[in-house]
Amino acid sequence: MDADEVRERAGSLPREPGVYLFEQGRDDKRRVLYVGKAVDLRDRVRSYADPRSERIAKMVERAETIDFAVTDTETQALLLEANLIKRHRPPYNVRLKDDKSYPLVQLTDHPVPRIEVTRDPADGATVYGPFTDKGRVETVVKALREAYGLRGCSDHKYSNRDRPCLDYEMGICTAPCTGEIGEADYAEDAEAVTRYFEGETGVLADPLRREMEAAAQNQEFERAANLRDKLGAVEALHGEGDTAVSDSGGYQTTDVLGAAIEGERAIVARLHAEGGKLVERDRHTLEAPDGEGTAGVYRAFIPQYYAERELPDRILCAEAPADPDIEAWLESEGVTLGVPGAGREATLVDLALKNARQRGGTDDESGRLADALGIDHPSRIEGFDVSHAQGRSAVGSNVTFVDETPEKSDYRRKKLTEQNDDYANMRELLRWRATRAVEGRDDRPDPDLLLIDGGDGQLGAARDALAETGWDVPAIALAKDEELVITPDRVYDWNDDAPQLHLLQRIRDEAHRFAVQYHQTLRDEVSTTLDDVPGIGPETRKRLLRRFGSVDSVRAASDEELTAIDGIGEQTAETIRTRLQ
């Protein structure tokens, strides 16, 4: 990729945290060259247009595509980046030799579970994380033990104790080993800890806050300060673990699916977790099932995708595929199908949906248009066209496409000044649209892109109107016949099968159709009105329609203009005037 290609691709990326991947090759032969994280994907990727090192410059030169995935937080991006580097081992990433993983919190699979911070969770454990700040995690685990008394000793020590250990004396363990607390009560305390990691911060934050306030009232300021710091760690920890998947129930691998429908196609985003850690993500495109919604997308995707792939232990979706055969097949393969309504899994499903709905990839037409033009992703595009009959009865159309689909409730049309000047008519049409937008008289959202039906002259006229009114929206034109895409800076001659060209052609053709339809409506109005005028036969009526186009134009015509039409003398002209007054 050269610098211009990098800038074009960067312009299509969202201003959100996430990870980006420079890749070589396409489709099944893609090789990941480099993985990076970003607080702002667009700005970070744009910086690669001017790489600071020779190594990265070579990487950019070899790359053919740039893929990405959005995350909710910068921390999630950091964790996903680390796991993608581990999985793909990209040649241009610098990897630590010990290749250590991030800390996790586990509740062991035991009737009296222990809680601990670990990088290597035990089989069957309920795992939370990963987290980036080990010190903060340890502070939270200690606070949980102080509040609920969960043990931290090994199973061997637990089974061989005959009296409470020092942890009991320190108040961080309730000594279930010697029966100081019953298993049922201990299980309730363990459940409270689970609720904290599943998102109920208050089970720990609320008692800490009460203790802090009491210490402050008793002027125990040092203790109050310590409790304040501990409370801060407890509340901050949830900002790190949003992508964690609980491993309770023996689920070592989990696929989280999010689906979105975009016109005639559907996008499915898959997030893959292993051992509680998000380690992979991808997006897939398929035809959208007719009238079935996203449940139909899941029903089509699951059997196709997993037919020749290893099934995970669990699949989470935003909604069930509503197909008993699929559910029976998954059950027979030992796969749990779930639709989480709340908690950490539901948060991860939301993230999968966010990735599915995220435009700007290489699969959608508007995303490719953004790539090709180097602009922000144009989810909302308005098209403009002018139609007239020999300079008379000029009308303008303004159509709207949202996510590549016509939004007919946002179509508008306008009668234009009667003059045989395409540029002036386009300038008037755009001035009307822009003025209404700037003055707040148009209830439609501002578009991301304007498409002008015409060539350089029409585009220039439109841009004049935009500059005059101060409406800051990018505009391009699609020229007829040669199908050239014209921007203020250059002219694009794309291949006939280019997806981005197909999108512009659909918008241009729809704007033209809507303008012609409106013009025909006005002509029909003229025809209907002229039917009642004595002395006007079918042929004369056709000549009037071709010459004037609208009732207003006929009404405004002079005697000389009317009598210039074959079949209309002075008396007929006077009759026309009388009937149209």
Swiss-Prot record:
An example molecular function term from Gene Ontology annotations: DNA binding
UVR domain residues: 202-237
Compartment(s) of residence: Cytoplasm
Keyword set includes Cell cycle: no
Keyword entries, A-Z: Cytoplasm, DNA damage, DNA excision, DNA repair, Excision nuclease, SOS response
GO CC field: cytoplasm; excinuclease repair complex
PANTHER family associated with the record: UVRABC SYSTEM PROTEIN C (PTHR30562:SF1), UVRC/OXIDOREDUCTASE (PTHR30562)
Family: Belongs to the UvrC family.
Biological function: The UvrABC repair system catalyzes the recognition and processing of DNA lesions. UvrC both incises the 5' and 3' sides of the lesion. The N-terminal half is responsible for the 3' incision and the C-terminal half is responsible for the 5' incision.
Entry protein name: UvrABC system protein C
Gene, per the UniProt record: uvrC
